[in-house]
């Protein structure tokens, strides 16, 4: 069974056993979280109602993405600024899709 869930402003297609990288979710590694914003669910070509459906996931790790460099320059004015940013994200392992784990 698969589901489309929304978290952190993005949508992910998940099934039991999948690992996904999402925007930061508060919690320690090993904690179980419930993703309740399920948009679509189904098995094969058959779709199922999503009312009350939840996806259970385990937090594997809290990590940071690679550094993104932001460089600003104004030519002929000796103006140069260099900033870096590392976005925080969470690695999740999907435990189950459906009401059984809720």
UniProtKB/Swiss-Prot annotation:
Keywords: Ribonucleoprotein, Ribosomal protein, RNA-binding, rRNA-binding. GO terms for molecular function: rRNA binding; structural constituent of ribosome. Part of the 50S ribosomal subunit. Contacts protein L20. The keyword rRNA-binding applies. It comes from the Bacteria. This is Large ribosomal subunit protein bL21. PANTHER family: 50S RIBOSOMAL PROTEIN L21, LARGE RIBOSOMAL SUBUNIT PROTEIN BL21M. Pfam families: Ribosomal_L21p (PF00829). It comes from Zymomonas mobilis subsp. mobilis (strain ATCC 31821 / ZM4 / CP4). This protein binds to 23S rRNA in the presence of protein L20. NCBIfam families: L21. GO terms for biological process: translation. GO terms for cellular component: cytoplasm; ribonucleoprotein complex; ribosome. InterPro entries: bL21-like, bL21-like_sf, Ribosomal_bL21. The lineage of its organism: Bacteria, Pseudomonadati, Pseudomonadota, Alphaproteobacteria, Sphingomonadales. Coiled coil: none annotated. Belongs to the bacterial ribosomal protein bL21 family.
